[in-house]
Amino acid sequence: MIELAELAGRLGDPELTILDVRSLPEFTGERGYASDPRQGRIPGARHLWVAELNMGRAEQIRELVGLPEGAEIVAYCHSGVRSADAVEALQAAGYRARNYVGSWHEWSRRADLPAETGASEQPK
């Protein structure tokens, strides 16, 4: 598990991959939950829908993620539930994965934290 303060302090860290496992409209900020004061994603996050992770074997997951086994990944969603499933799959595939339990529900409430919206360049 990772807390907000640690994640916020590591934005831009090239050794950490932030993985948003929500739906694509949630990731881009086109749709979200009315309870959140803003929509979007954590800056620098990559998108990979949780259903894609849960349907694959370890080698398939590594191919989807595109990172070497052992890479450090933080997964988040809206409230930490989908990302908990994602972390389980990522760990089974050999990643050092942690769940940001507060997820977008917590991040979106902090006006002092940056957010991105729209399409994103996904690393290949």
Task: Identify what each model region corresponds to.
Residues 1-17, 21-124:
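Rhodanese-like catalytic fold shared by cysteine-dependent sulfurtransferases
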